[in-house]
Amino acid sequence: MMMTVKQESPNSTLNTSEFSSDENLKTNNSEPPKKVSKSSTGKRKYHQKSRNGCSTCKKRRVKCDEQRPVCGNCTKLKLDCGYLHEPLENILNTKKDIANNEPPSKKRKRKVSTVSAASDSESTTQQATPSLTPSPNHSQDIKTQPVIPPTNPLSALSSGLLSAGNLNNLNVAHLVNNLSGLGDLSNLASLGNLASLSNLASLAQLPIDLSNLGSLLDSPAASNIAASFLGSAAATTVPPTTNSEFKESNQRKSQTQMPPQPTVPITSMGAATTTSSHQQANMPSRSKPQPETLQSSIPATTSGSPGMSYPGCPSNSDPFGRSSDKSLPNISPNMSIPANPLSDPLTQGMRSNLNMLDLKLMFHYTSVVANTITGAGISDTNIWNCDIPKLAFEHPFLMHSILAFSATHLSRTEKGLDQCVTCHRGDALRLLREAVLNINADNTDALVASALILIMDSLANASFPSSTSPKSLPASAWIFHVKGAATILTAVWPLTEASRFYKFISVDLGDLGDIINQGVNMNKSKGIDRENSAYYTDLECHDADIADLFPVLLDSPYLITLAYLNKLHKERYKSDFILRIFAFPALLDKQFMGLLMSGDVKAMRIMRSYYKLLRSFTTEMKDKVWFLEGVSQVLPVNVEEYAGGAGGMHMMMDFLGGGPAIVDDNEIDAEITKFDPSGTLTNKLIDTDNLPSVLTSNLDLMQGDNGFMNMK
């Protein structure tokens, strides 16, 4: 009986199974199978997700129906929909994707292994796709931990996007479009895992234009990487590399090159998804300025100087990143800008610390000092306010002269600029010495302007010999600067009509020829024989102390000096008088200079008459012209008569307050040598036959062996 039951049981079971199977077949034909819940299987079924949902639904972790402008969930619950605060760029990108019928990207969660803490850290690093939902095991930790930006964003980006789970066209586009936007492109050469981008592009079967990367890279290694990218992008075959092998190889490379770092969402990636590579190539690179010097990339010129710092000055750091304490101010003109923005030292220098002191001095010159020069009657307003500053950017010696003069004016109200004045003045003199050896039409106006500015600066800084200020000059320093200016003016004379100073600067003695010719014609009209009678000029005497020297004979060695002095008295209130009166000592002819040096009493009396005119003018104008204050303070009231061994030139130095400091006439030549080391221009200086004048060209008596200068 028992055997019968055991035999029937399988049969009954089989019959029941068959019946059940038949019933299931009928049911399958009529009704769909029931969905298996997650609780029954222990696993969540993967489904398609979209990134285009509103931020409010994302925070609530509910599915968004993506209705715009307000989604259905937010409308139903009366919540503030994230679409209302979405940037316009994201809205346009979403509409563009819908128009192109592009399916939303898929994201898959990675399985988190709980074998060890190291594997947890590794899996966290691999989640590099922006805005990926963190693993449930780490979601709470990420909320509590502060966000630490990676030391190299390019490394973190590449290591994540090269993972096996992120091999899709969207992520490849993310990587490509953001390579040119990342600042630290210099680290491309050190990223070995980027070399696998060729395999990545091939696996994704995405034709990528990486030509814009080649123009952004400087190093040969980085250029080679870009070349490999270009070669791989053109490939059409897929390498036999599985996702698992690719994942393991990139993990090994990432572990050897950089430590694991927490995943940091990069919000800029979403906006860059639909940005074309052509637009990225036109964007300026946001590169970090490198502390390299400008001098190393600019060829050395004759007008350059080694530095831009002022020892002892309260100035900011060097505008091009240098901090040498021994260097002098440097302004290098005509710098060529390289095509590559990353290798452009000018761009990097401009982004580094600027020399605010020099900028302040230039602003002070254009806003204040230039108007004082015009107010003193020295040429036109536009020349000093507009033309001269523009020329200064082309000629460093003029720039240093302007900055020195501006610092002198500013030092009257602010302290701590003495060393700055000295540095700029020294560089201006040094660069002028080089520039006068190569005079041409392009630098003529700059030379004239620089010479005039240095004259005014020396007048402003004239001081007593006991002064200890670094910016102070000897009381007679203006004479040497005038001599240097006369050297320059003589060398560039006559000025062409194209010169800015053609109508305003006049140091010629053209009207002296008219005076002498008038005297000759008057004698001829009276029937006086030239060979048997002495000729006199019609020069007027304006100083009773030298009245006995009038009338002046045509063959008098004092004729030219007295004629120029007479001209000064007549033109005292003309616009350019300030230049004429201070240029007088520099334009003395050689014959009168010889008499003065030998101690000729009449020559010294003429110089004393000039001195009285000079002091009277400076005393009258010192309150109106600020740079006359210095020289007006050092000019004594009375000049006692010198005679004998003191020497005429020493007398000239003494009444200016600088006599005791100069004990040898060779020191004067040494000062002039600063402007003319070779001596080629000195031969032209203070030479009657080479004065910037029409005198010698109009009068035959000044030429040849029969000239009146050679008459005995």
Swiss-Prot record:
Gene3D superfamilies: Zn(2)-C6 fungal-type DNA-binding domain. Its main location: nucleus. Disruption phenotype: Shows increased susceptibility to the azole drugs ketoconazole, itraconazole, and fluconazole; drugs that act on ergosterol biosynthesis such as terbinafine, fenpropimorph, and lovastatin; as well as malachite green. Leads to lower ergosterol levels. Decreases pyroptosis but has little effect on filamentation in the macrophage. CDD domains: GAL4. Residues 54-81 bind DNA. Residues 1-19, 113-143, 252-306, 326-337 have a biased composition (Polar residues). Residues 35-50 have a biased composition (Basic residues). It is found in: Nucleus. GO terms for molecular function: DNA binding; DNA-binding transcription factor activity, RNA polymerase II-specific; zinc ion binding. It holds the Pfam family Fungal_trans_2. Induction: Expression is up-regulated by ergosterol depletion, by azoles, and in anaerobic conditions. Transcript is repressed during co-incubated with macrophages, a condition that induces filamentous growth. Promotes positive auto-regulation through binding to its own promoter. Residues 1-52, 95-150, 236-342 are annotated as: Disordered. The keyword Cell membrane does not apply. Changing residue 642 to F: Leads to increased ERG11 expression, increased cellular ergosterol, and decreased susceptibility to fluconazole. GO terms for cellular component: nucleus. The keyword Membrane does not apply. Changing residue 648 to D/S: Leads to increased ERG11 expression, increased cellular ergosterol, and decreased susceptibility to fluconazole. Keywords: Activator, DNA-binding, Metal-binding, Nucleus, Transcription, Transcription regulation, Virulence, Zinc. One of its GO terms (biological process) is positive regulation of transcription by RNA polymerase II. Gain-of-function mutations in UPC2 are more prevalent among clinical isolates than previously thought and make a significant contribution to azole antifungal resistance. This is Sterol uptake control protein 2. It comes from Candida albicans (strain SC5314 / ATCC MYA-2876). The gene is UPC2.
